[in-house]
Amino acid sequence: MNQLARNIRASVSAVAFCLAVAAPGVASADPMRVAFGDIATVESLHLLAALERAKEKGVDVQMTFLKSEDIAAQAVVSGQADIGVGAPYALLQKAKAPIRIFMQLSTLQFYPVVNTDFYKEWKDLDGQEIAVHSRGSGTEAIMQLMADKNGIEYSGISYVPGAEVRTGALLQGNVKATIVDSSGKRVLEDKAPGKFAFLPLGEVAATDEALFANTDYLSANAADVEILVEAILTTWREVAADPKAVIALRDKYKLLPDATPDMVADIEPYFTEAAAVMPLNGGGEAAARDDFDFYTVSGALEGEPADLKVEDFWDLTALNKVTAKIGTK
């Protein structure tokens, strides 16, 4: 177990684990410590496969799964991790941390949902408690944005990492209002048709998950970072072209060995739907501008979107080099 996991063991969920396999011919002497503020699920299979491909190219990737995106971000800020997964815009602005996003992994694709025994529409959630993924996450931003749009205020927000966990909590009656991903939506519709209502969201274009790192790390480990970015982009494009490719990648790299039959059956449907919105060019300046529009409205960022500078939040060096090499889609 690496130092990051030891230092914050108390915050790591019971299912947390490390993937640390040294690849031959490593590109640098030090491992690349990646902190992911979630559990490993079907939704992260393509990322896990891309990390395995980076290992094959000589990058010693060490992945640690943590309780929340907030913990992952703090691990990067404190130097306990090199790279984090999330969208830490509020942290970047308020803490003035020398951290920059260098690649977009996914855009927001979520579904606010309520138990119809208690609620029917957004107005019904005024003064009620909701559950989201984690503090500062895209799920929280969406729910706060919709509260503002509908003139309501929640009584409290519970942080429940993992869309699958929130879906299960709905089915068990432990949560009455939350936000789930496309897999959760299908599960709810299949297992309890008519019991849950999906609230209207409108069009949302913003980063859900991205890779971010300390600026010194990005400069000192440029070769490793470029290998990682290329591995992710090529994997994303392969999956977008053929969602069934994720099944073969899971088998090849022996990923999620403890997945249930239901989870395995969900792989192709999930990625068939996700393929349409996967960022095949890693985001970049246009994605940053979309994020400024969304996260200023949701309250995660302060100021006017037009006044925010991309370079204060993103480092596009590695992404630009890789897309110049492999082209854009």
Predicted regions and their residues:
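Bacterial N-terminal signal peptides
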Residues: 11-23
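Cleavable N-terminal signal peptides
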Residues: 16-17, 27, 54
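Pocket-lining segment of extracytoplasmic ligand-binding domains
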Residues: 88-89, 165-256
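Secondary-structure end/capping motifs
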Residues: 221-303
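Short, glycine-/small- and polar/acidic-enriched structural segments
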Residues: 30-161, 167-172, 176-182, 198-205
